[in-house]
């Protein structure tokens, strides 16, 4: 019987070998090509600037008229661009709103994230209240937009509220509870303490007209 010549196996790492592997079917190659094509390209500087202009205009419109009362045409007009140009960056009003709310939630959570367990309780709580008041003063449109979203049932950020916001509040509530157990602050429900701070500080932005009407323009 004639002896069979030994079969030389090519390394799987070889590009030529991978192209001829049985697993590299046309369907799989097409799937890889589709996945590569679906990967978003990085935005250019001009594209990022355009998006920022649109988001700033949308913040102005949404905070003034709410989601339902706002239109793409209004946002385009405030942004100073045509409606087709705006739709190139954001095909739907919902996409603009969700993007705004996602970025807003990050900003809104930042003051609470700074509360440290190893800090002095009174200093930490006072600092948190001060930061929240500064946000109400410096970002009133964002605060009103967030309040409007809550009144609508938070359809665009409910997942972030139930995960990111809840996790952060749970963490800080535990810090407050520890301080209470150590006798450093009076005992109360830590969650309702946080809620009370939210209500007090955000009132100045969410009810700006009421505050100014009662206090007068000079004090409001």
Model-predicted segments: where are they?
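Generic hydrophobic, amphipathic alpha-helix propensity
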Residues: 50-58, 75, 100-104, 108, ...
